[in-house]
Structures are given as C-alpha cells and as structure tokens.
Amino acid sequence: MSKAWSGRFKEDTSKDVELFTESISFDKALAMYDLEQDFAHLEALLKAGVISKDSYENIKSGLKKIKQEIEKNEFYFDISKEDIHMNIESRLYELIGEDAKKLHTGRSRNDQVNTDLRLYLKDHILKIFELLKALKQQLVLKAKEYEDLIMPGYTHLQRAQPVLVAHYLLSFKEAFLRDSQRLIDAYRRIDTLTLGSGALAGADFPLDRFLEASILNFSKISRNSMDAVADRDFAIEYMFCLSSIAMHLSRMAEDFIIFNTEEFKFIDLPDSLCTGSSIMPQKKNPDVLELIRGKAGRVYANLINLMVNLKGLPMTYNRDLQEDKEPIFDATNTILNSLKMMILIIKDIRFRQNIEAGNLLLATDLANYLVEKNIPFREAHHIVGNIVAYAIENQKPLESLTKEELNNFSKAFDKDAKDIISKESSILRKKTYGSTNKDFVKKQIDLSSSEESIDKNL
C-alpha cells in the first residue's frame, strides 16, 4: 500500500526524510489505543451508512487479527509507513484488501492521534493512581509502626523541634494525596473525545460522536474541531501532575539519603535496595534513592520540552506536535518506575530506636512556658535565646539546666519548668489539630482509611 498522501507527489520520499519524520519507533506505544479507536470509528461508519455490513464485517475481522498480532508481539512496525496509524492501515490492507481503504473515512490523523493520546493518558493515570495509593498505604503502615518514636524536625536543615516519626511520614502521605487529587482533576479534562474533528473543520459524514464516546468510555465530546486537534493542554496538565509527583519523591529521597548517612544515623536501608562501591569495600550506597532524586529533573525537562514545543504553534495542527509523545512516554515510564521503587523502600526502611534528637530542640517549649507565665512572646523569645547561648557556651543540654540557672535569665521560671524540658513533653504540649501531638497523629492515621474513598472517584 502506497503512502496515504502519495497522490499529490511525483517523486518518492527520500529515505533520509523517512528516517527523520518517522514516529513509529516510539508511537507504537499507542498501538492498542489506535485499535480501540478503529473499532469505535467502524461502528460509527456503519451506523451512518457510510460502509456496508459486508465491509464492516471484513474490516472488523482484519482489526481483530491485527490486535492478536500486536498482543503476541508478531506485528511488524515499518518505518516507511511513518506512524502507528498507517502501519495498522497498511497491515489491514494486506489482510483484507480494498475494504481497508474505507476505514479512514471521516477522520484525519490529526483527530486520530489526539484521541489515541487521550486514551493512553487515561489508562496511565489509573496505573499511576494505583501506585500512589499503594505508596500512601505503605506510609500509613510505617507511621503505625513508629507512632511513638521521636525524631528532630528540621527547618533550614537545622534541628528545630521534636516530632513523631509517624508525623513526619504522614507529611509525605499528605503530599501524595494532593498528587492523587490533581490526577483526578486532570483526568476529567483529558476525558474528552476529539475523534470526529477531522483535520480541523469536522467530518462531512453524519458520524455519531456520542456513540464513539460511549464505546471508548469518554464522558464528553469536544465542542470545537479546531481547538480539538490543536489542543495539548491536557498533556501539559498531565505532565505537571507527574512533575509534582517527581518533586515529592525527590524530596523524600533527599531526606532518606541524608538520614542514612553516618552523620545522621536515623534510618537503615535494606541491602536489597542498595549497591556497593567497586573500590571501597565498606560502602553501602543509596543508589535507588539517588536515582529517584535524579530522575525528577528528567520529568521536569519533559514538561518544559512540551511547553516550549507548543508556545509558538499557529492554529491548528502542526507536525511539531509529533514531538509531544516521547516526553510523555518517558515521563510516564519514569514515574511508574520511581513509584514502584519508593514503595519498596518505604516497606522495608527501618528507623533506629536511638535517634538523637539534639540538645536545643526544646527552646521553643521554654519560650512558650514563659508565655504561659504572662511574658509577651517576643520577650520570651529573647530570654530563651540568651539561655540557648549560655547552654552552648557551657556545653550543657537544656534539659540539664537547673531552676537556679534558668532564674538567672527570668524569675518567671518555677520548679515546674523542668517538667516541660523533655522531648516527650514537647510532643504532648502541642494542642492544635494537625500537630505532632500523638493523639492528633493517631487521628490522622485512622482518617487515612476513609480518605481512600477519594481514590475511588475515577
């Protein structure tokens, strides 16, 4: 079968041009989605009376054969056929003959590829969604395991205040919950059928787009054919969702990399998820975490790639849009793999029971104690700042300071001041919902199961 557009041309396409313009090397990932669309379009052609029942049956049998070949990895993808659409159509012609030429009636590759891409994104959002759900569940399980363990919380990578390990882990669960919600929002906009828009002006045949939408499980159809074939907003939104996931994975990986060092010694990583050094026998390197962190930049770059591609395109379709798929496929596979790895890490990570919280983490508690003694917070802050300087100069932890020493800075300190200078007291003194107080953390753990109902909205 000659090229679909060869009638206009007197010369064969240069082999160099074929190699430069082909997309089958990567858009073969859309093969099954393209076939789904072919089956739906075939139904619309029959209903509109554009093809006969005999042609319909012939085409349908050929498409089923192609589907089997693809599923068995027996389909030959030919660069000379340009893209996935023409590869399938050419193979259909080989199988059934002239009827194959009728399938493309009433559509363009412009609306065809847009629909394929939406089908791909919907499918992969569901896959990513399930992995996010599994990751959140692992974080909750790990939080339950360490719901009594205290660690230092950080600002500016400086020890700040004591927090429960469970509270720390649940902070990431909240971030991934937002990622799940963003995916739901993106899914709703992706869930629009653009098939039937043609090259840009629509189809000349009375094709039932609502029938096609129903068959392909789209909740709505596009309203403007020009916008439909030009639109890649939905892909950008999807890519931002992936970038946000990558960011949260990277931040968590960064923490674990730091916490795993000899300088911190907060966590232990399983041998099965680490690698060694070719020269230093003692090394146990967190390579998986480092790659999760590194791959975040790759996902960001794919988002920027797509946005830069789109920024200067005139309406409507331009061949530049062929370049949307590789960044999307790469970012998708990167996120799928990174999520799988992080799930394994959370499942097997171990927090050490003897985490050293540090000597100065209770300074804020001392300041708040003075506030309870009717000293304005700014004044209390200054007083405790002087106490901290004294403790550092004399190499004393705050817990060891006597009432007499504290009274040198403020007579408001009573004997009960010693009761609050402990990590456990600091945790218990937190009174706001969402704080690291054990009761509130336990409520957050219990709420997590009900929040999974959000995950069923797709």
Curated annotation (Swiss-Prot):
Gene3D superfamilies cross-referenced by the UniProt entry: Fumarase/aspartase (C-terminal domain), Fumarase/aspartase (Central domain), Fumarase/aspartase (N-terminal domain)
- InterPro entries, per database record: Arg_succ_lyase_C, Argininosuccinate_lyase, Fumarase/histidase_N, Fumarate_lyase_CS, Fumarate_lyase_fam, Fumarate_lyase_N, L-Aspartase-like
Q: Which GO terms describe its molecular function?
A: argininosuccinate lyase activity
Q: Which reaction does it catalyse?
A: 2-(N(omega)-L-arginino)succinate = fumarate + L-arginine
Enumerate the subcellular locations listed in this protein's record, separating them with semicolons.
Cytoplasm
What keywords is this UniProt entry annotated with? Answer: Amino-acid biosynthesis, Arginine biosynthesis, Cytoplasm, Lyase
**UniProt entry tagged with the keyword Transferase:** no
Q: To which pathway does this protein belong?
A: Amino-acid biosynthesis; L-arginine biosynthesis; L-arginine from L-ornithine and carbamoyl phosphate: step 3/3
Query: Its Gene Ontology biological processes?
Result: arginine biosynthetic process via ornithine; L-arginine biosynthetic process
GO cellular component, as recorded: cytosol
- Name the top EC class: lyase
Which residues are in coiled coils?
none
Q: What is its EC number?
A: 4.3.2.1
Where primarily located? cytoplasm
Give the matching Pfam families.
ASL_C2, Lyase_1
Q: Which family does it belong to?
A: Belongs to the lyase 1 family. Argininosuccinate lyase subfamily.
Record-linked NCBIfam families: argH (TIGR00838)
Under the heading PANTHER family, the entry gives:
ARGININOSUCCINATE LYASE
Mind telling me what this protein is named?
A: Argininosuccinate lyase
**What are the leading ranks of the lineage?**
Bacteria, Pseudomonadati, Aquificota, Aquificia, Aquificales
Q: Which gene encodes it?
A: argH
